UniProtKB/Swiss-Prot annotation:
Keywords: Cytoplasm, Hydrolase, Pyridine nucleotide biosynthesis, Pyridoxal phosphate. Its cofactor is pyridoxal 5'-phosphate. It comes from Aspergillus oryzae (strain ATCC 42149 / RIB 40) (Yellow koji mold). This is Kynureninase 1. The gene is bna5-1. GO terms for molecular function: kynureninase activity; pyridoxal phosphate binding.
Amino acid sequence: MGSRLHVQEIKKGPPLPFKDDIRAFTREYAESLDAQDPLRHFRDEFIIPSKKDLKRKTLNANENIEDSSDPRSIYLCGNSLGLQPRNTRKYLEHYLRTWAIKGVTGHFTPHDDQLLPPFVDVDDAGAKLMAPIVGALESEVAVMGTLTANLHFLMASFYQPTKEKYKIILEGKAFPSDHYAVESQIQHHNLDPKDAMVLIELENLDRPILDTEKILRVIDEHASSTALILLSGIQFYTGQYFDIEKITAYAHSKGIIIGWDCAHAAGNVELKLHDWNVDFAAWCNYKYLNSGPGGMAGLFVHENHGRVDMTKVGSKDEPFRPRLSGWWGDDKKTRFRMENRFVPQPGAAGFQLSNPSVLDMNAVAASLEIFNRTSMAEIRKKSLDLTGYLEHLLLKYPLDAAPEDKPFSIITPSNPAERGAQLSLRLGPGLLDNVLEVLEENGVVIDERKPDVIRVAPAPLYNTYADVWQFCQIFFDACQKAVRARK
């Protein structure tokens, strides 16, 4: 009788943590979490595609795309492409207006109602907005280029192979573009990737996780011949969040430079690139940072590597780190003198080449401005709860099934500290296509990695607990239908 009364009291009271509340599997519980969410107002800052939008065959540019009677989609794909902030249009219109009424003088003419400074200084504004998101000094960040191009620029500076130290260590299952970039850098130095490219391979394909100790063992094995390590902050396929601080410190203890591809980490987890003494990093801004498809990327160069010794300029001693140079990295005070004597700006700005696309910078800034209204600590706190709730619902389905009988398994680490927003679900053989069909029919947007994985990533700025709950109901139904179809 006592336990029954206890259950009744729980049902009447405020929501408890989802692991302790029997109501966690109800829509009402999810909505109660949304009502208590201190970041809930940020959802209104983004345009959520409707279910009708996803099925439309024409753009109909003059049509209202935000009909309140048209249900919104369940968009859990911020790990692939973030949604459009509402203020992106305003930022772009300000840019177009400036270009229209000022032409080339827009490079230097400030306006009382400007959202960004004149064209010549927009890169500084981008760095200021980006720095707190990746835990960097403003001088250590540049918003520029694209991810793989930036990795090439950085490796051109940081990969300086010698006869003794010439190897690059990276994941065996790194994102293909990273693999290609490393391979081509090695070939560019007339080295053989078969000898100079060290891949950290998985020990168990059924558990596609790279333990930190495994990574450290590989570093130990090749320390005397390794010139550079390049790893992902968060692994794109599994969603595993690597221990950046520990691995970086270990690499440095062996005298090895280490860089990080933070494409799936920037805007997702709380990075501290400066405090962790990361040598360099690069990332794209179109995933969790919502800058639009192929939007301008970012890079980080620790202040230890960005110094310019003005007392040595013009001497035989190298006053700054070697790099591929361009005029936009030149000292601002002398840039427009066209003297053909390169002296870089200190910090990451000195790694810039061409002047940035002001159009793209406005799209990046529109989203970063929203991030700067809160903090990555607060965003990460909600993300842990949101993805934890998703995991809780997934693990309880179906309640009466043994693990080997479930239609899916979660291949992302179960420790919340070892993952970001994303959970990667591996479906049973032959289920993927049918599951995707049901999800699409019901306005659910996720992405897949064939032959059997879907990636689900609730973005804390615009996704809700109700989104997560509703996704799970549709996903469970999709699994049931796919299992029946397979039989």
